[in-house]
Amino acid sequence: LVYRDIQKTKNNVIIKNDLPFEKSDYEEKIFTHPTMLFRYSAITFNGHRIHYDYPYSTEEEGYKDLVFHGPLQATLMLRAAEKYKKAKAYFFSHRGVAPVYANDNLFINIENNENGNLNCFTSTKDAGMTMKGEAKF
């Protein structure tokens, strides 16, 4: 969870993060559909309205759209890493660096690293890198 100061603003500034590597060994594209966010909120008992209540998310919290779940983003990244490696990871770490919003394309990028494990990151066109991680096999 990320707690922010209460502020009502229409001036959403997007800071574009640099991507950690130019070309991925593997990439998936996921559309961040609002229904996916609602369902994930339901199955994880997450009642935070920024994930499913558009007027609340945009008018009260000042986001540009519904906010995509960080844990869902991490789960999708781990799933893509295991699919690419065709094995189950014994360790996975991740860190969110920028928000992802509904109604956008989320790119999941996987790259082999020198230790035989995988570097992972997610990105959007507007924000650049949104989450980074490593899967160990």
Feature annotation, model-predicted:
Residues 1-32, 100, 107-137:
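HotDog/MaoC-like acyl-thioester-processing domains
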Residues 2-68:
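Catalytic strand-loop segment that frames the active site of acyl-thioester-processing enzymes
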Residues 20-22, 30, 57, 82-86, ...:
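Homeobox/homeodomain signature
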Residues 36, 77, 129-131:
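Detector for methionine-enriched segments
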Residues 45, 82, 115:
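Residue-level marker of positions within ordered structural domains that often coincide
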Residues 54, 62, 90, 95, ...:
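A residue-level detector for conformationally permissive "hinge/kink" positions
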Residues 63, 69-109:
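Hydrophobic beta-strand-centered segment that forms part of the acyl-chain substrate-binding groove
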